[in-house]
């Protein structure tokens, strides 16, 4: 199904009964066609934090939790965010014998939509801690030039030719939902091993997404592919933690080497 057929940007009724068929899968293949040869495009995870989870226990008493969904990057489909919100709303008045029964139902439904095994972890509402970013923040640097749309020619190696392993981050990632045009804000982490990149050029490249229309997952994959092709690292990780919208935040991560998979985190802006 095409994204134009989704409920994004459309007025909808919020369901009050269990409706797994509201979930809307979007095929990853089309946006990945030009990156098919890139190592790591299908390696990684999409982590979602769901802050508006509620269901009824066996006695009909409302339960609440924060959820972390883990969706493999190798899945044929991602799940459109508004449909996921509506799906979780449809569970608000549904009774389950146990918390485990609730988890198993959600995992079954999301796995069917994604075409791969999806996992749900629940946290008590006070237990999902806020982390501080690790690495070098590049936001105070001065880019040599600025562009209004993603431009891979901005990416340059440092003149020193030094071999390094480093983790950088920027809070300045901004892109737009390709359907509604609403801005998406995030922090992007880049772990890099190879010839030292020019940090100013990386910042300029990240800033160039500010008027780009793309889903979170697609933006991270484009960033990963452009760095991989233009800077040719030995190893690479790109991980973006986007801010919340509609009770959900999306956190895609792609790695060239599975040993570089980070643990999922939640930042202050989320």
UniProtKB/Swiss-Prot annotation:
Substrate binds at residues 79-81, 216-217. It catalyses: 7-aminomethyl-7-carbaguanine + 2 NADP(+) = 7-cyano-7-deazaguanine + 2 NADPH + 3 H(+). The keyword Ligase does not apply. GO terms for biological process: queuosine biosynthetic process; tRNA modification. GO terms for molecular function: preQ1 synthase activity. Pathway: tRNA modification; tRNA-queuosine biosynthesis. SUPFAM superfamilies: Tetrahydrobiopterin biosynthesis enzymes-like (SSF55620). Transmembrane segments: none annotated. Gene3D superfamilies: 3.30.1130.10. It is found in: Cytoplasm. Its main location: cytoplasm. It holds the Pfam family QueF_N. Keywords: Cytoplasm, NADP, Oxidoreductase, Queuosine biosynthesis. It is an enzyme of class 1 (oxidoreductase). The keyword Repeat does not apply. The active site is at 177 (thioimide intermediate), 184 (proton donor). Belongs to the GTP cyclohydrolase I family. QueF type 2 subfamily. PANTHER family: NADPH-DEPENDENT 7-CYANO-7-DEAZAGUANINE REDUCTASE (PTHR34354:SF1). This is NADPH-dependent 7-cyano-7-deazaguanine reductase. The lineage of its organism: Bacteria, Pseudomonadati, Pseudomonadota, Gammaproteobacteria, Moraxellales. The gene is queF.
């Amino acid at each position: 199904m095409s994204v134009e057929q989704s409920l994004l940007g459309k007025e909808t009724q919020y369901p009050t009964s269990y409706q797994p068929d509201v979930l809307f899968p979007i095929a990853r293949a089309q946006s990945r066609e030009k990156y098919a040869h890139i190592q790591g495009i299908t390696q990684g995870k999409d982590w979602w934090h769901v802050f508006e989870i509620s269901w009824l226990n066996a006695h009909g008493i409302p339960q609440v939790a924060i959820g972390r969904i883990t969706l493999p990057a190798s899945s044929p489909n991602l799940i459109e965010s508004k449909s996921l919100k509506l799906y979780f709303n449809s569970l608000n008045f549904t009774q389950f014998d146990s918390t485990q029964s609730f988890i198993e139902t959600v995992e079954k439904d999301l796995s069917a939509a994604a075409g791969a095994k999806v996992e749900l972890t629940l946290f008590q509402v006070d237990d999902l801690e806020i982390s501080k970013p690790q690495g070098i923040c590049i936001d105070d640097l001065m880019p040599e030039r600025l562009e209004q749309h993603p431009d891979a020619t901005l990416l340059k190696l440092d003149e020193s030719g030094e071999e390094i392993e480093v983790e950088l981050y920027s809070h300045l990632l901004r892109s737009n939902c390709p359907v509604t045009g609403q801005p998406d804000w995030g922090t992007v982490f880049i772990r890099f091993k190879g010839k030292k990149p020019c940090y100013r050029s990386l910042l300029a490249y990240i800033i160039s997404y500010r008027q780009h229309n793309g889903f979170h997952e697609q933006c991270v994959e484009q960033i990963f592919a452009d760095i991989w092709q233009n800077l040719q690292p030995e190893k690479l990780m790109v991980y973006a933690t986007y801010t919340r919208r509609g009770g959900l935040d999306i956190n895609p991560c792609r790695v060239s080497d599975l040993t570089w998979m980070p643990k999922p985190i939640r930042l202050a802006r989320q």
